């Protein structure tokens, strides 16, 4: 009996040890997941307690490996936008990859925020002034904490933002791989009309009138007056379109950034963008970027009503006097932007 009793006692001790080990492991697992779900809180420079991304999760982790097991509708939407760009690049490889290798000069539109590991490709006439303001605040390059305190002209001073072309090749490759890259796009012809209205119908834009207006009038207007040739301040939209579709124009020099195509400014067939925001959902998409960057607790995208904004109805009116032939040629110039960013052919177009 004694050997049997000793054996039972020994087995009981083993069972208790195994149970204690399992319980301890279970408690450790609970603590681990609690720490994952409740990252350390730090105080941001604006005096508000928010979750600080540094030392925890990067924007790329937040985007592609969210803590929530189920993807949000927003994440699914942006995945669809990424897929649209990829599919368009693949289907139009000959057209979209005319250049196989990018040079540092091709990266001058990509603004870098080191602190939050963000890269933003700015596209003129797609809320780029406000996004440059935000990038100035995020990167700490300036004296401002409120984006709307930054004068518009100061947001466009190149020294106030660091762009990707300022880095060495290894540094460029590292940031393209590790940082969250995003851009904002707009219906191509609405953006084009917005650029025309801003640069050619406003009297204060004398530099554009001199640089481009005089050239457009000289090339496209018969019997132009000497005053028009000298000032270049009364360019008609029809003349602007004729200038854009003229093969000589792009052979002479690249388009100005305000009417250059997005795929030529940001190179989405060479650079994988993690987020494609749209002007039509500007506030929602912008605040999603800020949330992924871990700053939505104290920074929001600036919103204000702009009565001079170019609308779809306005764009329709501008295209009424453009011939079907010129509309077709202009669509070919911006075709990749329409396809990549899933904009349908406008109803007002009369394509040949």
Curated annotation (Swiss-Prot):
Keywords: Carbohydrate metabolism, Glycoprotein, Golgi apparatus, Membrane, Signal-anchor, Transferase, Transmembrane, Transmembrane helix
Primary subcellular site in the record, as a coarse category: Golgi
Cytoplasmic side stretches: 1-16
Annotated membrane topology: Single-pass type II membrane protein
Pfam families given in the database record: Sulfotransfer_2
Chain sites annotated for binding 3'-phosphoadenylyl sulfate: 124-130, 186-194
Listed EC numbers: 2.8.2.5
Protein's UniProt keywords contain Repressor: no
Record-level GO BP terms: apoptotic process; carbohydrate biosynthetic process; cartilage development; chondrocyte development; developmental growth; embryonic digit morphogenesis; embryonic limb morphogenesis; embryonic skeletal system morphogenesis
Glycosylation sites: 205, 223, 321, 342
Protein name: Carbohydrate sulfotransferase 11
Organism: Rattus norvegicus
């Amino acid at each position: 009996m004694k050997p049997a009793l000793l054996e039972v006692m020994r087995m009981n001790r083993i069972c208790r040890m195994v149970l204690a080990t399992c319980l301890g492991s279970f408690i450790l697992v609970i603590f681990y997941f609690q720490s994952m779900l409740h990252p350390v809180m730090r105080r941001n420079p604006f005096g508000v307690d928010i979750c600080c991304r540094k030392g925890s999760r990067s924007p790329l982790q937040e985007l592609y490996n969210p803590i929530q097991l189920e993807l949000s509708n927003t994440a699914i939407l942006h995945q669809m936008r990424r897929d649209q760009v990829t599919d368009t690049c693949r289907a139009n490889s000959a057209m979209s990859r005319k250049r196989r290798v990018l040079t540092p000069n091709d990266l001058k539109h990509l603004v870098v925020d080191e602190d939050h590991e963000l890269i933003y490709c700015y596209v003129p006439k797609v809320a780029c002034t406000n996004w440059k303001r935000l990038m100035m605040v995020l990167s700490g390059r300036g004296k401002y904490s409120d984006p709307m305190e930054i004068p518009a002209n100061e947001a466009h001073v190149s020294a106030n933002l660091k762009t990707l072309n300022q880095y060495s090749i290894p540094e460029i490759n590292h940031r393209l791989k590790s940082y969250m890259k995003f851009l904002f796009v707009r219906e191509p012809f609405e953006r084009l009309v917005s650029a025309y209205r801003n640069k050619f119908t406003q009297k204060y834009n004398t530099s554009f009138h001199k640089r481009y207006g005089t050239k457009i009038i000289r090339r496209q207007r018969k019997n132009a007056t000497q005053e028009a040739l000298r000032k270049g301040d009364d360019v008609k939209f029809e003349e602007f379109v004729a200038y854009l579709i003229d093969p000589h124009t792009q052979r002479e020099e690249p388009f100005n950034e305000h009417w250059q195509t997005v795929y030529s400014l940001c190179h989405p067939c060479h650079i994988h963008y993690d987020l494609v925001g749209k002007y039509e959902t500007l506030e929602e998409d912008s605040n999603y970027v800020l949330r992924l960057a871990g700053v939505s607790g104290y920074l929001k995208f600036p919103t204000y009503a702009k009565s001079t904004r170019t609308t779809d109805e306005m764009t329709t009116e501008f295209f009424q006097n453009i011939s079907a032939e010129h509309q077709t040629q202009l669509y070919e110039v911006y075709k990749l932007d329409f396809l990549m960013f899933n904009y349908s052919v406008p109803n007002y177009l009369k394509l040949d």
